[in-house]
Amino acid sequence: ATGAGVSNASGIETYWYQYDPEYQPKINQAMHNNPARLAESEILANKVQESLISETGAINRGVRRETFAVLRETAIPAILVELGFMDNPSELQVIKQDAYHTRLAKALAEGIINWYGAVEGK
């Protein structure tokens, strides 16, 4: 749901923050460039993306690094998931279905559980 107007973009994508010295922290000085937090965010992004694609069959738009403040200014592992494109009429019809919401919720929970198992198993 990142565009305006009508598009044919579709699928699911997940973002995590990788340190960029161009973006200095405004809130999160202590954990801004914490290697463990950043590594766990990358693992979380991959686990959630894998689970979402497996559960929904949506187009895999991948896992990407970004410098969004919502990711940068956290003290814990963080991701941003784009679950679809509301400006694509056919995708919007899928996004509006209650059954699809249930599958998304299940996949998000499963991805978080898989992430937890991966980071706790270190």
Placement of each model-derived feature along the sequence:
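Active-site-proximal helix/loop segments of hydrolytic enzymes
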Residues: 1-122
